[in-house]
Structures are given as C-alpha cells and as structure tokens.
C-alpha cells in the first residue's frame, strides 16, 4: 500500500484548546478514523531559531520537541492537514511518500 508518513514537530509545553498539542493531535486523528499514531519525545534539538532545547533533570516544564507521527493514506493526510487549517493551528510538519504494509508470520 502507498501513502504518506506525516510528522508534526511541537514543543512539549504547547497547547491547543487547553490540551497538550501532541495529545490533541492524536485525539483528532483518532476521531478522523486514522488507525494509529505515535508521539516521541526528543532528547535535544534546535529549530529554525537556532536555540538548543534539551531536557534537564530538575526542570518542571520541558521545552523539548515532541514528534507526532502518522502512517496514513494520502486522503487521511489531507483530512488531518485540513482540520489543522480550520482550527488555525500553526505547526511545522513533514510529509514523506511511503510504502507500507504488514509482514505476516508465526506468532
């Protein structure tokens, strides 16, 4: 099957409608019928402003990046991007063509 890997990059402390943005993204994708998504926390990184963000042991609020990733059909990708535009969410994303499937085997 062919489709899209859709990745969003957000700061961990960013919210939308009083919910962490990465959690809101996962919930909205689920409501759209997308079959799965994952959120990954970065150890360290920098963005377009060149500021290094990294997690420290004693921080109460982290400012590191969260990557939210979906492997979807092109139609599902468009639905999710359209929703973000309607909600006026400003967010960086990467859209990569993908081939995906399931390898069946003995369990």
Predicted regions and their residues:
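Positively charged, small/polar-rich N-terminal and surface patches that mediate targeting and assembly
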Residues: 1-107
């Amino acid at each position: 099957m062919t489709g899209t890997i859709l990745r969003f990059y957000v700061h961990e402390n960013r919210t939308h409608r009083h919910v962490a943005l990465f959690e809101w993204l996962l919930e909205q994708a689920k409501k759209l019928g997308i079959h799965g998504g994952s959120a990954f926390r970065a150890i360290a990184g920098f963005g377009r402003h060149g500021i290094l963000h990294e997690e420290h042991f004693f921080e109460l609020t982290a400012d590191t990046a969260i990557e939210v990733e979906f492997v979807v059909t092109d139609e599902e990708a468009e639905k999710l991007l359209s929703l973000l535009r309607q909600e006026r969410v400003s967010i960086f994303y990467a859209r990569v063509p993908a081939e995906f499937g399931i390898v069946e085997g003995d369990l």
